[in-house]
Curated annotation (Swiss-Prot):
PROSITE patterns from the UniProt entry: GH11_1, GH11_2, GH11_3
Family the UniProt entry places it in: Belongs to the glycosyl hydrolase 11 (cellulase G) family.
Designated name of the protein: Endo-1,4-beta-xylanase
GO molecular-function term, one example from the UniProt record: endo-1,4-beta-xylanase activity
The keyword Signal is annotated on this UniProt entry: yes
Xref: InterPro entries: ConA-like_dom_sf, GH11/12, GH11_AS_1, GH11_AS_2, GH11_dom, Glyco_hydro_11
Alphabetized PANTHER family for the sequence: ENDO-1,4-BETA-XYLANASE A-RELATED
E.C. numbers: 3.2.1.8
Pfam families (alphabetical): Glyco_hydro_11
Origin species: Niallia circulans
Length: 213
């Protein structure tokens, strides 16, 4: 979920996914999950492209999450993507995003953002894929999640110290983040829910075009 200076939940999108709000479709050999959720505010035009491609144009939105990835996440997955367009005007993340259960954890690996860079309780750093990421944790109480509207869960964050350049192929070696989190006592759950490379935004405008494999 988003953690901005103002109290709102951009992750509400993912949190509210509960079955009816998200759709999964077989879209490529390497990706099988298409996520498209909006709270109804503003205009969000999302396109489920061929293969692992998706695009989204948004204007004066509330909260939305659009992305492609996998129905079942993995701690061992290497995510490749190309953000040919990444142009947020306001709050937004370009991020690997997903959930685990047992325990219930919401996690982010944020490669770029708009006007706000997320933070939390600082735990350390991890070097991966040509960049250094700050590690944070946050906790949500009585908040929406994949398990209901009023749950308590922890969020794990790896946030790149500087925005990652876009427009060329990029890699997120997720295992590096998982191992770094473990070293700080941040253990993910044993039951993996979806895992997507997402465009997430709140009260903003912009456009993105991302291919995931």
């Amino acid at each position: 979920m988003f953690k901005f200076k103002k109290n709102f939940l951009v992750g509400l999108s993912a949190a509210l996914m509960s079955i009816s709000l998200f759709s999964a479709t077989a879209s490529a050999a390497s990706t099988d999950y298409w996520q498209n959720w909006t709270d109804g505010g503003g205009i969000v035009n999302a396109v489920n492209g061929s293969g692992g491609n998706y695009s989204v144009n948004w204007s004066n939105t509330g909260n939305f999450v659009v992305g492609k990835g996998w129905t079942t996440g993995s701690p061992f997955r290497t995510i490749n993507y190309n953000a040919g367009v990444w142009a947020p005007n306001g709050n937004g993340y370009l991020t690997l995003y997903g959930w685990t259960r047992s325990p219930l954890i919401e996690y982010y690996v944020v490669d770029s953002w708009g006007t706000y860079r997320p933070t939390g309780t600082y735990k350390g750093t991890v070097k991966s894929d040509g960049g250094t990421y700050d590690i944070y944790t946050t906790t949500r109480y009585n908040a929406p999640s994949i398990d209901g509207d009023r749950t308590t869960f922890t969020q794990y964050w790896s946030v790149r110290q500087s925005k990652r350049p876009t427009g060329s192929n990029a890699t997120i070696t997720f295992t590096n983040h998982v191992n770094a989190w473990k070293s700080h006592g941040m253990n993910l759950g044993s039951n993996w829910a979806y895992q997507v490379m997402a465009t997430e935004g709140y009260q903003s405008s912009g456009s993105s075009n991302v291919t995931v494999w």
